[in-house]
Amino acid sequence: MKPSPVKSTIDFEQDGLQHGFLKLPHSHDESAYGSVMIPISMVKNGEGPTALLTGGNHGDEYEGPIALFDLARTIDPRQIRGRVILVPAMNYPAFQAGKRTSPIDSGNMNRSFPGNPEGSITEKITDYFQRTLLPLAEWVLDLHSGGKTLDFLPFCAAHRLEDKQQEQRCAEAMRAFNAPYSMMLLEIDSVGMYDTAAEAMGKVFITTELGGKGTATAETVRIAKRGIRNFLIHAGILEGSPELSPSIHLDMPDQRCYIGSESNGLLEMKVNLGEKVLEG
């Protein structure tokens, strides 16, 4: 396979705090020699584990980018042991456009793994994550929310996996994140997902859904920031004690947990998110 066309402007082995870009050449009508410039930050202090923290996998989900851009600005290298790689907006073209998918190639990044160094813009970005960034990390956190089309109770999720020891490590990280809701989830459409790529490499991987409706609230951003800190403490990278509060544990073990309409029409909500309902 050919080398990735994506080039990083930061040195992944250098101690200290660095801010830079993942630079991907992209010739288009407005710039013959243009590039997609994806912000990336890294903080490193000696030897230790590596965490890869990502947001903006879908461009209309804002809690991750807000929390990670803030962390990149405020993190102190003296407070960590190891390395933290931050990519606040993985699909940066989609993030700039406020769209779920890329305006360049309509690529859904979370259905484009493992990517292709000779493919579309989205496939070239996912290939760089697959072959360069994911192999650097033992711990992976991908922050999502509902975007413009969904609304969620704020939860952190770990997946049901064939490797039960890996599943247990992921579940422990999910509980450490300490969102208001903690979910064990069996993905029913996992082909091409970032999640699947990370888990296939044996990583400790967790993800979130922190609201939606195409916006971010002060509360969901607070949940993201607190959860990131707790995750890094749990990974043994960040100093300090976790900030914990009660979390409701949920389980989505199979396809019965998904109910879709088979017809068009007007939807009237009878209950709000989080309300208890009876079967039948």
Placement of each model-derived feature along the sequence:
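Structured catalytic-domain cores with a bias toward divalent-metal coordination
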Residues: 1-279
